[in-house]
């Protein structure tokens, strides 16, 4: 048996007839399967035991030899070898075909490989193979040409005329003769000569032919092997036949297809023996050809063969294809043992790294561990009695279970797993009941709620798996979101509300201005009702024990509230005292304005002071980031647990409720609406007089109503009491926002009709007042569209993620530094005047390519090759530097991956990326996961020139698939000045540079962006709209396209409020640009017109340049992610993605080697993935658990000094 962890590559090729015979254990001669009476396999049939091995372990067909002691004996009566039954999964048979048959993949695929080799059209091939025409194989000395097609009539005429001086024949036999006659070397040389002169279609055809012929020449495959003499029969266990309850049999479709082949083959043999007339033999040969076609790929040609109920039969190709095929169903994703699933409920008292596991579930999952422990403790005599104990659930089992579970993490997963935080490890705590308890803070990462969601539990079995789960996957380790490096475990809903309530301030509350000797005294006063949580009080700075206060401040008083004292108790000791929600308070220290001398009259002072706003959701997130930066993981997770407990406690104490009386309707609403109605009437008058067009009228009406709604919204927010429960909910960020509130108390505003156009009649009522019937009806459009969109969006977004993962799965951090000599210059990304992504965001966590100096003082801000953290980036931005050159994935030279320096910081851990990190997968997940939050719609902005801007998910797909965008803009190919803009029947823009002048015709309906006298640079847009990236590539080269795609993707996500790290998009775009189309091969021997990886292209050129020969020339191509995935070097990865048969056909002809560099290939063949701890360098490491060591020590009789795992 092959050892999966020990082979270097996997190769695929065409099988020669002899190879097929060498695989086989015997010929299948009969179409029978099993005997209907004895249910034993028929001899020489499709399930024959002599060929494929015994059905029962160590037992021959006739029963002469039973038991393992006869291992390896071949029975003299029935000829069956005595061995294990599982050999029936690996032994193959064969069928000797009475006539050669063409393989449908090579004849029918697009392009037809047989057609390319023979230089015949697929149409004529089909006529020959299916016995409609003769083909001349040897013209002899007749005027006929080789490969000329003759109809039956013509053949007769020529035969009568020339007799046997020429040969022409039909069927796959003729094709095989033609294939065998080909001299590959001669053909290749002829084609290379032709390429030097050929143009257009002829050139394209020649390149395609050359590619196939070269493939045959280099791979050692014979072209004639595309025609089969022998057909392999796959092992019977892979096409099983099973008995159902009613005595009927269910069988794999392959058996039916094989039976048809065998029947027709046997009939053909008989006809040939009888010397039947030619026409009958030909018909039988055609039927045999069709039967083999159906077996290999049913439905590829003609009508598919159907089984009972007109269902097409599943052929060998269908076994591989699609979601249910071998690749995606069994090789890339398998069902696993030691798992369970149940409904989740909230576990507010769990620690960050814990989850509640139902007792009975835990017992079932950890059964083998419990049984082993029962035996080793002497509570059961053997495994069998231990098993019985566990199944009867005897009392001592629970104690053992507690022990087994104590240090054993489990994995919790919620589907859909959109990013790596969808599976995390927890320490299980046994709970009563049947629901899994989940920590409330990890819900965001899982996108889980408790309305009936279910989660699956998996048990890591080996010591290695447990160590990885504990060190890498524990929930407390995954505080940052890999997509942007911000905390993903921010408190939500009740927790936010509780902390908001806790840190509120009230003027003139009970006991305002009291001074207490320390926080304990203040708390006692609060518990006894002397002060309120919101009362502004003072405490001595010295009593707080905070090292961030200066020595001279220690005898002053700090103005704060009781709630804030409580809130600060959960923070680490050396963290600044947080008194106001500002960045400087977090990063530096408490602002001095809250410190007053100890003899101050606090009560009087407070009367003049404004109230400090409470801490909202965003600020809590900043606190977590800051704590993480200063104190790392353990401290942060402890602080998070304390923040959660505080939030729950005080949102309960606050007793915030919502009633109808909390929704106050605005008194000035009527006036605002009347005013708007008057404006609309004025517009209508202008329209009726013909002063404005229909479009302008519509636009103005819409803008009047949206302005009215905005006005109502701002007035509402102004009149609200800060203690209004609904306002508190939306202001704190717990639930809802200003626009929800406007709909409740103000007006609902404008709605869109089903086609997405805004109806100009607004909904004037609010929910508090109630909608009229018409208003309600109009509202339903939007609601229904929302639900339909969500359903479609989920599928689209999931498919996008799958394509992204596929294209980037082999991008792994392979080395420390690739030593590239190029960097990427970054500036803030802007859209008009609005900044989409600031320079700060683009610098944090990246390595500087050049030393950056302060523009005024010339002081070094960051050295070349240094990683920029938050502080450095802030200094650079504050110094007024506008552009910085950084190391980027775009310019990385590492083969099959990236290097540490070009990637920079790993956003998920906040520290340097490690060698072996699968950054491609992380990038794909980070871009795909927020996909569900993007909108589906194409915005139709009204206006005179209505242009459709594609946004949201469709725009992202358009960018990553490198499609021609909707509403394409015209771009200039040269730098220069706009010298002329012609408007009229033919709109034109003329750009002039020093060397040339170019005219660009502007399509009707496009809006111009340039005017005469503007300076333009190559690749700049002349009209509004999106650029076609393929055009841009021709004009600006790779740099321009990379920059454009990065900017556009960021724009879509940022406008939806989703932040994604640049480096993720860079990884994807780099994968789209990794190929070059060879224009002229020079002396490199690369085929012209082929797609080659940039690195391979450069290496080939380096070699020929060193020998003073001619290098190849090529131009970079931009591939969409689907195309890029299929163009990958690994055929296993491509075949398991899409177009399985095409990829495998191609790979077999080329005799491709898969070097197993990516993740998918290794998952498919069952090796460890070459990333993370699966890297070769970790293979030699062994893992000792304390448990094994204790056992060894006891055996050796040494004193028990045990190394415990960290």
Swiss-Prot record:
Alphabetical list of Pfam families matching this protein: RNA_pol_Rpb1_1 (PF04997), RNA_pol_Rpb1_2 (PF00623), RNA_pol_Rpb1_3 (PF04983), RNA_pol_Rpb1_4 (PF05000), RNA_pol_Rpb1_5 (PF04998)
Needed co-factor(s): Mg(2+); Zn(2+)
GO molecular function term, any single one: DNA-directed RNA polymerase activity
Keyword field: DNA-directed RNA polymerase, Magnesium, Metal-binding, Nucleotidyltransferase, Transcription, Transferase, Zinc
Gene Ontology cellular component terms for the protein in this record: DNA-directed RNA polymerase complex
A Gene Ontology biological process term: DNA-templated transcription
Enzyme Commission numbers on file: 2.7.7.6
SMART domains documented for this protein: RPOLA_N
Source organism, top-level taxon: Bacteria
Gene3D superfamilies assigned: 1.10.132.30, 1.10.150.390, 1.10.1790.20, 1.10.40.90, 2.40.40.20, 2.40.50.100, RNA polymerase II, clamp domain, RNA polymerase Rpb1, domain 3
Binding site for Mg(2+): 449, 451, 453
Positions of Zn(2+) 2 binding: 818, 892, 899, 902
Cofactor note: Binds 1 Mg(2+) ion per subunit. Binds 2 Zn(2+) ions per subunit.
Catalytic reactions of this protein: RNA(n) + a ribonucleoside 5'-triphosphate = RNA(n+1) + diphosphate
Known function: DNA-dependent RNA polymerase catalyzes the transcription of DNA into RNA using the four ribonucleoside triphosphates as substrates.
NCBIfam families membership: rpoC_TIGR (TIGR02386)
Protein family (similarity comment): Belongs to the RNA polymerase beta' chain family.
Protein name: DNA-directed RNA polymerase subunit beta'
Gene source species: Shouchella clausii (strain KSM-K16)
């Amino acid at each position: 048996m092959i050892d999966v962890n020990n082979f270097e590559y996997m190769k695929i090729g065409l099988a020669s007839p002899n190879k097929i015979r060498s695989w086989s254990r015997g010929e299948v001669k009969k179409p029978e399967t099993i005997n209907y009476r004895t249910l034993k396999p028929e001899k020489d049939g499709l399930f024959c035991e002599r060929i494929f091995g015994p059905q029962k372990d160590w037992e021959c067909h006739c029963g002469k030899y039973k038991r393992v002691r006869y291992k390896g004996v071949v029975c003299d009566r029935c000829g069956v070898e005595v061995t294990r039954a599982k050999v029936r999964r690996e032994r193959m048979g064969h069928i000797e075909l009475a006539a050669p048959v063409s393989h449908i993949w090579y004849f029918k695929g697009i392009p037809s490989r047989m057609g390319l080799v023979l230089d015949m059209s697929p149409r004529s091939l089909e006529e020959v193979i299916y016995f409609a025409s003769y083909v001349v194989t040897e013209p002899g000395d007749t005027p006929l040409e080789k490969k000329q097609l003759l109809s039956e009539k013509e053949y007769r005429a020529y035969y009568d005329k020339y007799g046997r001086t020429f040969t022409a024949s039909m069927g796959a036999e003729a094709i095989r003769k033609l294939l065998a006659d080909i001299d590959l070397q001669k053909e290749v040389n002829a084609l290379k000569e032709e390429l030097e002169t050929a143009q257009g279609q002829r050139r394209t055809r020649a390149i395609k032919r050359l590619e196939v012929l070269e493939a045959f020449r280099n791979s050692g495959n014979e072209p004639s092997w595309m025609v089969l003499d022998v057909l392999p029969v796959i092992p019977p266990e892979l096409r099983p036949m099973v008995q159902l309850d009613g005595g009927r049999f269910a069988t794999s479709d392959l058996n039916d297809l094989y039976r048809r082949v065998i029947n027709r083959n046997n009939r053909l043999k008989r006809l040939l023996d009888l010397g039947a007339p030619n026409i009958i033999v030909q018909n039988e040969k055609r039927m045999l050809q069709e039967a083999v076609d159906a077996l290999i790929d049913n439905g590829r040609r003609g009508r598919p063969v159907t089984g009972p109920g007109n269902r097409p039969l599943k052929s060998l190709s269908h076994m591989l294809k699609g979601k249910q095929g071998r690749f995606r169903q069994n090789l890339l994703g398998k069902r696993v043992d030691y798992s369970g699933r149940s409904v989740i409920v909230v576990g507010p008292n769990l620690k960050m790294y814990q989850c509640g596991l139902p007792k009975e579930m835990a017992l079932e999952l950890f059964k083998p561990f419990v049984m082993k422990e029962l035996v080793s403790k002497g509570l059961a005599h053997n495994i069998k009695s231990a098993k019985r104990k566990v199944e009867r659930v005897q009392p001592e089992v629970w104690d053992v279970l507690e022990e087994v579970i104590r240090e054993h993490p489990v994995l919790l997963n919620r589907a859909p797993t959109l990013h790596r935080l969808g599976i995390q490890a927890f320490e299980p705590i046994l709970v009563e009941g049947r629901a899994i308890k989940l920590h409330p803070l990890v819900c965001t990462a899982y996108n889980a709620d408790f309305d009936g969601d279910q989660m699956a539990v998996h048990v890591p079995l080996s010591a290695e798996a447990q160590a990885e789960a504990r060190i890498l996957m524990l929930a407390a380790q995954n505080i940052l979101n890999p997509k942007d490096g911000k905390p993903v475990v921010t408190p939500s809903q009740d927790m936010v509300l509780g902390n908001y309530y806790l840190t509120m301030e009230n003027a003139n509350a009970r006991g305002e201005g009291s001074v207490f000797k320390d926080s304990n005294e203040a708390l006692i006063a609060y518990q006894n009702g002397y002060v309120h949580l919101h009362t502004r009080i003072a405490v001595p700075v010295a009593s707080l024990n905070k090292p961030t206060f200066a020595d001279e401040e220690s005898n002053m008083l700090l103005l704060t509230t009781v709630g804030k004292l409580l809130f600060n108790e959960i923070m680490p000791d050396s963290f600044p005292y947080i008194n106001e929600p500002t960045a400087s308070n977090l990063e530096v220290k408490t602002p001095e304005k809250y410190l007053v001398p100890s003899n101050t009259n606090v009560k009087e002072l407070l009367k003049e002071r404004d109230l400090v706003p409470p801490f909202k959701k965003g600020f809590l997130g900043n606190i977590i980031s800051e704590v993480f930066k200063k104190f790392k993981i353990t401290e942060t997770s402890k602080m998070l647990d304390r923040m959660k407990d505080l939030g729950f406690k005080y949102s309960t104490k606050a007793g915030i409720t919502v009633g109808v009386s909390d929704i106050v309707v605005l008194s000035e609403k009527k006036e605002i609406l009347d005013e708007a109605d008057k404006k609309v009437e004025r517009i209508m008058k202008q329209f009726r007089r013909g002063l404005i067009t229909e479009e302008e009228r519509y636009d103005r009406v819409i803008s009047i109503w949206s302005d009215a709604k905005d006005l109502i919204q701002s007035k509402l927010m102004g009149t609200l009491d800060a203690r209004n429960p609904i306002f508190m909910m939306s202001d704190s960020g717990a639930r809802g926002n200003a626009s929800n509130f406007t709909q409740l108390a103000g007006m609902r505003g404008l709605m869109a009709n089903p086609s997405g156009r805004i109806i100009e009649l607004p909904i004037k009522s609010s929910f508090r007042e109630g909608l009229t019937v018409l208003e309600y009806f109009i509202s339903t459009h939007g609601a229904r569209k929302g639900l339909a969109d969500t359903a479609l969006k989920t599928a689209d977004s999931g498919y996008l993620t799958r394509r992204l993962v596929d294209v980037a799965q082999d991008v792994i951090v392979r080395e420390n530094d690739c030593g590239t000599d190029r960097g990427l210059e970054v500036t803030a990304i802007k859209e008009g005047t609005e900044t989409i992504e600031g320079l700060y965001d683009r610098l944090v966590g990246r390595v500087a390519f050049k030393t950056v100096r302060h523009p005024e003082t010339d002081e070094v801000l960051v050295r070349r090759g240094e990683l920029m953290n938050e502080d450095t980036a802030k200094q650079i931005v504050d110094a007024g530097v506008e552009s910085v050159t950084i190391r980027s994935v775009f310019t990385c030279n590492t083969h099959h991956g990236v290097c540490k320096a070009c990637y920079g910081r790993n956003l998920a851990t906040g520290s340097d990326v490690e060698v072996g990190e699968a950054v491609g997968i992380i990038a794909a997940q980070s871009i795909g996961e927020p996909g569900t939050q993007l909108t589906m719609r194409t915005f139709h902005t009204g206006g005179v020139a209505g242009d459709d801007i594609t946004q949201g998910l469709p725009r992202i797909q358009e960018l990553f698939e490198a499609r021609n965008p909707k509403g394409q803009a015209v771009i200039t190919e040269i730098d220069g000045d706009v010298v002329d803009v012609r408007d009229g029947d033919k709109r034109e823009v003329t750009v002039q540079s020093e060397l040339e002048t170019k005219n660009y015709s502007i399509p009707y309906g496009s809006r111009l962006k340039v005017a005469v006298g503007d300076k333009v640079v190559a690749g700049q847009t002349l009209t509004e709209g999106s650029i076609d990236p393929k055009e841009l590539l021709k004009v600006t080269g790779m740099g321009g396209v990379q920059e454009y795609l990065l900017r556009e993707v960021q724009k879509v996500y940022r406008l939806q409020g989703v932040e994604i790290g640049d480096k993720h998009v860079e990884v994807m775009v780099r994968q789209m640009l990794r190929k070059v189309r060879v224009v002229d091969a020079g002396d490199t021997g690369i085929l012209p017109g082929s797609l080659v990886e940039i690195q391979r292209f450069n290496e080939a050129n380096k070699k020929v340049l060193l020998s003073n020969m001619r290098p190849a020339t090529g131009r970079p191509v931009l591939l969409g992610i689907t195309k890029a995935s299929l163009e990958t070097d690994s055929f296993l990865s491509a075949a398991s993605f899409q177009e399985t048969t095409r990829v495998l056909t191609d790979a077999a002809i080329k005799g491709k080697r898969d070097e197993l560099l990516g993740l998918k290939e290794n998952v498919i063949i069952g090796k460890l993935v070459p990333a993370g701890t699966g890297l070769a360098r970790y293979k030699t490491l062994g893992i000792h658990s304390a448990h094994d060591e204790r056992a060894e020590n006891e055996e050796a009789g040494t004193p028990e000094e045990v190394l415990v795992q960290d």
